Amino acid sequence: GDDVKSACCDTCLCTKSEPPTCRCVDVGERCHSACNSCVCRYSNPPKCQCFDTHKFCYKSCHN
């Protein structure tokens, strides 16, 4: 849906396996819209990171 279309990631790390396993390691006040496994640290502002893994990276947030 739209969540996946609007999801973006600036720092995506992938393994060298085939297919690759990729994870977005951006840290922000919230996780991207398509994130299922979001972990936030209680700080001000909160620091959230998505722990989903995919075979691809989302497009960059800041072109």
Curated annotation (Swiss-Prot):
MF annotations from Gene Ontology: serine-type endopeptidase inhibitor activity
SMART domains documented for this protein: BowB
Keywords: Disulfide bond, Protease inhibitor, Serine protease inhibitor
A cellular component annotation (GO) from this entry: extracellular region
Membership in a protein family: Belongs to the Bowman-Birk serine protease inhibitor family.
S-S bridge residues: C8-C61, C9-C24, C12-C57, C14-C22, C31-C38, C35-C50, C40-C48
UniProt site (Reactive bond for chymotrypsin): Y42, S43
Gene3D superfamilies recorded: Cysteine Protease (Bromelain) Inhibitor, subunit H
Site for Reactive bond for trypsin, residues: K16, S17
Identification of the protein by name: Bowman-Birk type proteinase inhibitor
Organism phylogeny: Eukaryota, Viridiplantae, Streptophyta, Embryophyta, Tracheophyta
Organism annotation: Vicia faba
